[in-house]
Amino acid sequence: MLGSLAKWLRIFGFDTFYPDATTNDDEVLHIAKAENRLLLSRDKELIIRGKKAQLQVLEIQTTDLDTQLAQVLTHILIDHTQVLTRCTLCNTPLISVEKKAIKTHVPPKVFETRDSFWYCSVCHKYYWMGTHYENMIEKINKLTNKNNR
């Protein structure tokens, strides 16, 4: 499964559909075709079926996340204005919220030390620029610099 890759593609700002365990291959192919999506998979049979259906496909070659991301980033470009604009859990675009509106929804230390916040209207999860954010930006920069060499 490519759940970690899907999460990171969302962090990079890509509109990323990740099927749950109940979604079968026929449904995945239908969604990919209907929504004009790039199909990423390690499943050779699904890749073959995607090619036969004339979908854009990319067979992921490894289980290593950084290598997976590097492979994907050789095929699609990051729009840096979209980085960290989607919920990592459900893919919904995040909404910027005013600091005063979230006081009871984030830890007190976060409220005291951070000024910018975002909200997922589907998951009801809050995001802010903390150490996770800084680590993600560092990883994005590392991967994009490596791919631009």
Residue ranges of model-derived segments:
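Short hydrophobic-aromatic micro-motifs
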Residues: 40-41, 119-120, 127-128
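Surface-exposed, charge/polar-rich loops and edge strands
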Residues: 83, 121, 145, 149
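Short functional micro-motifs and their immediate structural scaffolds
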Residues: 92-98, 128
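Short cysteine/histidine-rich metal-coordination sites, predominantly Zn2+-binding motifs
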Residues: 101-112, 135-146
